[in-house]
């Protein structure tokens, strides 16, 4: 297993909280998530327009709410800004935050700003859900599936690292969140999470949460399964729900790829962590 994920697991275990372990924490009626988006860790400034940096920093956090079938309501922003940024630059950042917030009906209610040599953004989203979708709940014999097409983000990242250029239509720049599908499907799903670190890496998290492994229907290329920052959904459901899931996905114009079955076996991670 990747060294960083070992350290991440160790760090999380130090807190010994039952609220940690899903895409977001459940506190009463609220679903609370936080994500960081740091320059030279998650992105390089030359890759993005400023408004796109702000937009993506919001979207990756909103994804955590949607992954738990929660409706995002409010957001808090912590933004570190270089002194070299002009007022028009800051206005561009604002427009990116607002674009994402407006898209999902979110009100930005506060936060903090500090000076820094790089752009670092941390977003907290508060959401509500009538029926929470969690990582825990997968059963032996359940089918595993992911939405959409994976691999675009890794392809774009490779191109950016080599040539400082990639198609702006790539999911690396603008992930597509599956809010409508998850809202319709949650009552028939046993578990779910978003694919942020890559399919194989996130399967490891699902395996750990449910103490199960997987039998794959076909070999999945690493170019697909090791592509992080896709923000598609990874879900598990009873085989009897197969036709219903495919029908729901089609109705929402969302491709659903069934690729494995849950089994009582060990699952070994086949990829390195996406960022580290």
Model-flagged regions — what are they?
Residues 1-276:
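Helix-biased detector of long, well-ordered alpha-helical tracts
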């Amino acid at each position: 297993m990747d060294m960083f994920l070992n350290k991440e697991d160790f760090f999380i275990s130090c807190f010994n909280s039952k609220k940690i372990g899903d895409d977001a924490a459940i506190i009463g009626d609220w679903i609370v998530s936080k994500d960081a988006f740091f320059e030279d860790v998650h992105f390089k400034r030359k890759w993005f327009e400023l408004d796109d940096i702000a937009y993506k920093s919001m979207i990756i956090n909103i994804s955590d709410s949607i992954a738990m079938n929660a409706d995002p309501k409010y957001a808090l922003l912590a933004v570190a800004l270089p002194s070299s940024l002009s007022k028009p630059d800051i206005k561009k950042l604002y427009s990116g935050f607002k674009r994402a917030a407006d898209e999902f009906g979110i009100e930005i209610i506060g936060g903090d700003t500090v000076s820094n040599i790089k752009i670092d953004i941390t977003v907290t989203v508060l959401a509500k859900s009538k029926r929470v979708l969690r990582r825990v709940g997968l059963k032996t014999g359940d089918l595993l599936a992911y939405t959409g097409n994976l691999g675009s983000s890794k392809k774009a990242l490779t191109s950016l690292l080599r040539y400082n250029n990639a198609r702006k239509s790539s999911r690396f720049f603008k992930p597509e969140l599956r809010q409508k599908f998850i809202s319709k499907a949650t009552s028939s799903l046993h578990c779910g999470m978003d694919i942020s670190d890559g399919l194989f890496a996130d399967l490891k998290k699902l395996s750990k949460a449910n103490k199960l492994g997987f039998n794959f229907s076909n070999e999945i290329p690493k170019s697909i399964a090791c592509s992080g920052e896709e923000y598609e959904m990874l879900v598990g459901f009873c085989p009897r729900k197969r036709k219903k899931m495919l029908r729901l996905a089609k109705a929402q114009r969302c491709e659903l790829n069934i690729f494995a079955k849950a089994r009582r076996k060990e699952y070994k991670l086949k990829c390195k962590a996406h960022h580290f």
